[in-house]
C-alpha cells in the first residue's frame, strides 16, 4: 500500500514521526512502505525488518499496518476512527496513519487498536476538537448539565496541536423561584350601613432565571432566559423576577465548569467535560506538542 500522507506541518514530517523507513535514491532520502527480500529465488514481502546495531537488534520497518489519512473539516457529531476504518474495507487491528483536523470538530474517538499501532493527530491553527457544552438548568433550582468529552483514545497517538482540544463547558445552574407578597384592602358592608375594610395578604409567583449553556461544539442550550453557549464562551444566566427569586448561573467557557445560581440560591453548575480520556496512550509529541488543552486529562 502506498503511503497516503506526505504532509509536513511546522517543519515536522508525519512520515518521519510515524517511523516509516527510508532509502537513499540518487542522493536523496525517500520514504518507502514495502521492503521485499529474495528468499529461495523468489521476492517476498516482509512484515518486519530488524537490524543489529551496537550488539542489539532494532526494528526498522513494519509492513503489516493499514495506512490511512482522515481529514476532518468540522462536524457536529463524533468522529469514530474504528467505524471510519471499517468503512475503508479493513477489519484488522493494526493501523498507522494521520487524523488532520481542519475545522471545529465535535469529539474524536480513536478507538482501541493494537499496541504497535500509531495515530498522528494534527489539529491545525484556529481549529479545534471540542465536546458539546452542557445545557443550563431550568429555573426552580435545577442543576446545569455536564459538558462532554473531546478526545478518547486507547490507541497510541502522537499529538501535534496547533489549535485547541477542550471539553465542553458545564451548563449554569437554574435560580430558585419565590413569591411576591403584597397586601390589598378589601371593603365590605357592615353594621348600620357602614362600610368596613380589612387587609388581605396576597402573593404571586416570582420566577428565577434559567442557567446559560456551556461553550462547546455545539454550545449547550440556555433555559428560561439563559443564553445559549457559543463556541468558546458560555451563555449568561437568565434574570430573576425579584422578591427573593434568583438569577441563573453563567455557562462555563470552553473547558470550564458552569456557575451555580446567583448567591448559591439554586442549582449547581455542570462540570466541564474531559479534554483527553487516554492521555497515557500519548506515544510522543511532535510539531506544536500538546498545545492548548482545556479540561482534565485522564487515563
Where are each of the predicted segments found?
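A structural detector for beta-sheet-dominated domains
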Residues: 26, 38, 52, 69-73, ...
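Enriched but not universal
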Residues: 1-94, 282, 286-299
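Extracellular beta-strand-rich solenoid/capping regions of secreted or surface-exposed proteins
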Residues: 73-92, 103-119, 136-157, 277-278
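Exposed regions on extracellular, virion, or secretory-pathway luminal proteins
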Residues: 2, 28, 40-42, 54, ...
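Glycine-centric low-complexity/flexibility signal
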Residues: 4-17, 97-104, 124-281, 286-299
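Generic detector of isolated residues embedded in canonical secondary-structure elements
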Residues: 48, 120-122, 275
Amino acid at each position: 500500500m502506498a503511503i497516503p500522507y506526505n504532509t509536513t506541518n511546522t517543519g515536522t514530517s508525519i512520515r518521519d514521526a510515524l517511523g516509516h523507513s527510508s532509502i537513499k535514491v540518487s542522493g536523496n532520502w525517500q520514504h518507502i512502505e514495502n521492503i521485499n527480500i529474495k528468499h529461495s529465488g523468489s521476492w517476498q514481502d516482509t512484515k518486519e525488518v530488524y537490524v543489529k546495531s551496537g550488539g542489539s537488534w532494532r526494528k526498522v520497518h513494519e509492513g503489516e499496518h493499514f495506512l490511512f489519512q482522515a481529514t476532518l473539516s468540522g462536524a457536529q457529531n463524533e468522529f469514530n476512527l474504528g467505524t471510519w476504518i471499517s468503512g475503508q474495507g479493513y477489519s484488522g487491528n493494526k493501523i498507522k496513519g494521520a487524523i488532520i483536523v481542519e475545522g471545529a470538530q465535535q469529539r474524536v474517538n480513536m478507538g482501541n487498536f493494537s499496541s504497535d499501532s500509531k495515530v498522528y493527530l494534527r489539529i491545525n491553527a484556529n481549529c479545534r476538537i471540542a465536546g458539546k457544552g452542557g445545557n443550563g438548568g431550568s429555573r426552580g433550582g435545577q442543576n446545569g448539565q455536564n459538558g462532554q468529552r473531546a478526545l478518547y483514545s486507547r490507541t497510541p497517538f502522537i499529538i501535534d496541536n496547533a489549535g485547541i482540544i477542550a471539553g465542553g463547558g458545564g451548563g449554569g445552574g437554574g435560580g430558585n423561584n419565590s413569591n411576591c407578597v403584597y397586601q390589598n384592602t378589601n371593603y365590605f358592608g357592615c353594621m348600620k350601613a357602614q362600610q368596613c375594610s380589612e387587609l388581605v395578604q396576597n402573593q404571586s409567583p416570582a420566577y428565577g432565571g434559567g442557567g446559560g449553556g456551556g461553550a462547546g461544539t455545539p454550545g449547550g442550550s440556555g433555559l428560561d432566559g439563559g443564553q445559549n453557549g457559543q463556541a468558546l464562551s458560555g451563555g449568561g444566566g437568565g434574570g430573576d423576577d425579584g422578591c427573593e427569586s434568583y438569577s441563573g448561573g453563567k455557562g462555563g467557557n470552553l473547558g470550564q465548569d458552569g456557575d451555580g445560581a446567583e448567591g448559591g440560591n439554586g442549582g449547581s453548575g455542570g462540570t466541564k467535560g474531559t479534554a483527553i480520556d487516554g492521555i497515557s496512550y500519548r506515544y510522543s509529541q511532535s510539531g506544536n506538542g500538546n498545545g492548548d488543552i482545556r479540561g482534565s486529562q485522564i487515563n
